[in-house]
């Protein structure tokens, strides 16, 4: 299956090992991955700060880069939500761009959503002999409605002991940007 990977800014700049691990998982599951070189920030940081007009350049670039992709996978629920939902609203006064955004929005998936709901995989063959917890991010859980896929994948990691987090569905605040 051919997919285009939306590589999120924070992963690119600060956590490239996370991006590489995600690529390895997808390749192991039989995906042929393209990481478009012309992609930039999705623009959601501008939108979250109230700068919708400033976001339009990044938004239009993302649409142009990904509009011919069959599947787009993002390891960031925030970016996936922005592309899936916010783009059409921000481009509402530009019908042609809004239509193009709508087509892209139908093809974007959050990482765990893609693995479980599209590939039909709940066990990626991982082993991790330690205790972990999981923060259920606002964008993934509440705005995108993705609740089961991350948990199904965690449940099937051999050796993993899952410890529920207090207030797991509370907002992390992302340094105040989302609150």
Language model segments and positions:
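Iron-sulfur cluster-binding electron-transfer modules in prokaryotic oxidoreductases
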Residues: 1-179
């Amino acid at each position: 299956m051919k997919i285009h990977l939306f590589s999120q800014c924070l992963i690119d700049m600060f956590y490239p090992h996370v991006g590489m691990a995600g690529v390895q998982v997808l390749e192991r599951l039989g995906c042929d991955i393209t990481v478009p070189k012309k992609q930039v920030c999705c623009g959601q940081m501008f939108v979250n700060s109230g700068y919708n007009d400033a976001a339009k350049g990044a938004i239009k670039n993302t649409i142009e880069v990904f509009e011919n992709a069959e599947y787009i996978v993002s390891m960031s629920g925030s970016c996936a939500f922005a592309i899936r939902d916010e783009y059409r609203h921000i481009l509402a006064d530009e019908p042609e761009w809004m239509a193009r955004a709508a087509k892209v929005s139908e093809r974007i998936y959050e990482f765990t959503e893609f693995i479980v709901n599209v590939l039909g995989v709940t066990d990626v063959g991982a082993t991790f002999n330690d205790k972990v917890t999981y923060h259920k991010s606002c964008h993934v859980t509440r705005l995108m409605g993705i609740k089961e896929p991350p948990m199904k994948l965690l449940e099937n990691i051999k050796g993993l002991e899952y410890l529920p987090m207090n207030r797991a569905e509370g907002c992390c605040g992302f340094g105040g940007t989302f609150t």
